[in-house]
């Protein structure tokens, strides 16, 4: 080939001989051709074999690779070095002779890297995490063989090394949420000394959970005794603490729980409530004889207020309609209702505002229970406190037949069948009076305690007075939902009559009807 003819890869000035003597042009020509073959190794198999041999000779030992790459940050692994072994000295002969030797004054430029770009985007796309190489399979210790990673990779310190020296960054340096150490903030939680559950604090001198605290408290307050079915060495832990009460109680005492601490707490509660005589919940605190006295006293006042002409009259003895008669009787009964409440034990000890709230919340149910029990001996009608009888037919003609029938079937008939006495009636009314759900109470808990005392007194009375009737106490309590439902329905009727203005409603009853709206 003539050098006068321009090769396709040389610029025009090389072909025209503008680059100096012929020897220099030949040297440059060989250098460019060599670089061209090295850049395109697949065009020249001999050059590809020589490049592979040179790359193998340049790879340092595993111990020296990291030291050379990290220690000398300014050295390029592709540049010739005096310490690098010569591929010819190791017996690796290229298939084609290399080009003429280059003069020291004009060294060839370093070999450019293959046109692959950075390998990290490829790894990022396959792993979903930037900068992390693909994980090696278990038991694999050799170099990473990937068609994308076939050149040296620059290390973070500025040095370079072969792909075997690239270590994945340590996970958890940034953004990795590690679990707290064993000695962290959550390690100081105390456990229950009895069952090992999580402790809620120190109770009766020992760190314990709420379950063991309540168990010990109930045992002391109710003076309970237990027995063990086994050898009194049962396991008491979080799962089996309810299996043997005897062993659980003995473990409470063994760990240091104090009986006197429960008694002192109980005494402080009684002093706070102003109720220091007797045991909490005992029937003696709500004697049924005083409740009976309250019922009898109110009944005598009602009998004294009955007028002579209407005392024995029938359903049509009064010129007024049944609704008017009921409203007038209710208005008179409200005055005696206050006297009755004052005679109920512990009611007067409540704050005055709470007394008013309780009366306003239950006056309708209290009056319905009273005239329903009074009407036990009346057939198909009710007997009012004024002495007037209201017959079923009169109620239907006045438009209140549905609610009137409910009073007769759900209250009067049931009271008649079980022969409810006045003591039981008084206890039911006391339960209605002590309503802890009334809105605006300053201390609902105290009212609830009083209601529980009435429950206990009524149950004891039923067992002593009617021992053959095991379910009498339950039957009495079943009348309370009926009283509640009928009382709400009667309020709807009274509000309706008040709005239309056809029925005269006296002052006290009017105040009671308006009270819920004022309190709300």
From Swiss-Prot:
Q: Where is this region: Hinge?
A: 258-382
Residue positions where Omega-N-methylarginine is found in the record: 25
Principal subcellular localisation of the protein: nucleus
Stretches with biased composition (Gly residues)? 307-317
Where does the record place the NR LBD domain? 283-516
Superkingdom of origin organism: Eukaryota
As for subcellular location, the record says: Nucleus; Cytoplasm
- The residue ranges flagged as biased composition, category Pro residues, are 95-118, 131-140
Which keywords annotate this record?
A: Cytoplasm, DNA-binding, Metal-binding, Methylation, Nucleus, Receptor, Transcription, Transcription regulation, Zinc, Zinc-finger
Start-end of NR C4-type zinc fingers: 192-212, 228-252
Compositionally biased intervals (Basic and acidic residues):
64-79, 263-275
Q: Which residues bind DNA?
A: 192-257
User: What terms describe the molecular function in GO for this protein?
Assistant: chromatin DNA binding; DNA-binding transcription activator activity, RNA polymerase II-specific; identical protein binding; nuclear receptor activity; nuclear steroid receptor activity; RNA polymerase II cis-regulatory region sequence-specific DNA binding; RNA polymerase II transcription regulatory region sequence-specific DNA binding; sequence-specific DNA binding
- Which terms under GO biological process does the entry name? cardiac muscle cell proliferation; cellular response to retinoic acid; hormone-mediated signaling pathway; in utero embryonic development; maternal placenta development; mRNA transcription by RNA polymerase II; positive regulation of bone mineralization; positive regulation of transcription by RNA polymerase II
Specify where the region named Disordered lies, as residue ranges.
1-167, 263-285, 300-323
Explain the purpose of this protein.
Receptor for retinoic acid. Retinoic acid receptors bind as heterodimers to their target response elements in response to their ligands, all-trans or 9-cis retinoic acid, and regulate gene expression in various biological processes. The RAR/RXR heterodimers bind to the retinoic acid response elements (RARE).
Q: Which family does it belong to?
A: Belongs to the nuclear hormone receptor family. NR2 subfamily.
* Written domain comment of the UniProt record: Composed of three domains: a modulating N-terminal domain, a DNA-binding domain and a C-terminal ligand-binding domain.
Protein name per its UniProtKB record: Retinoic acid receptor RXR-beta
Source species: Mus musculus (Mouse)
What gene makes this protein? Rxrb
